[in-house]
Amino acid sequence: MPQPEQLPGPNADIWNWQLQGLCRGMDSSMFFHPDGERGRARTQREQRAKEMCRRCPVIEACRSHALEVGEPYGVWGGLSESERDLLLKGTMGRTRGIRRTA
């Protein structure tokens, strides 16, 4: 099935950045953990996802989206679930100098 080049209607402003994501069309299992995944396997999968995010032209838009909507699962904008949770609670931003973009 062909991928759309632009999203329709009011969603375009919110979601169009996803069309430029390096992850577009990739297997989502790289970014979202299977049930029960823990430890080394989870860490390694997250690191592979974050490597892709670091090269992505829309990393900032992706990260902002995930923080704004409180995305509960997966690696978004180079941040894992737990990293986003810490950022949203203010802990990580203060201790590591990471700022939240809006």
Swiss-Prot record:
One of its GO terms (biological process) is cell redox homeostasis. One of its GO terms (cellular component) is peptidoglycan-based cell wall. InterPro entries: 4FE4S_WBL, Whib. Its cofactor is [4Fe-4S] cluster. Its main location: cytoplasm. Residues 22-86 form the 4Fe-4S Wbl-type domain. It is found in: Cytoplasm. The 4Fe-4S cluster interacts with NO, forming a protein-bound dinitrosyliron dithiol complex. Binds 1 [4Fe-4S] cluster per subunit. Following nitrosylation of the [4Fe-4S] cluster binds 1 [4Fe-8(NO)] cluster per subunit. It holds the Pfam family Whib. HAMAP family: WhiB. The gene is whiB3. This is Redox- and pH-responsive transcriptional regulator WhiB3. GO terms for molecular function: 4 iron, 4 sulfur cluster binding; dinitrosyl-iron complex binding; DNA binding; iron-sulfur cluster binding; metal ion binding; protein-disulfide reductase [NAD(P)H] activity; protein-disulfide reductase activity.
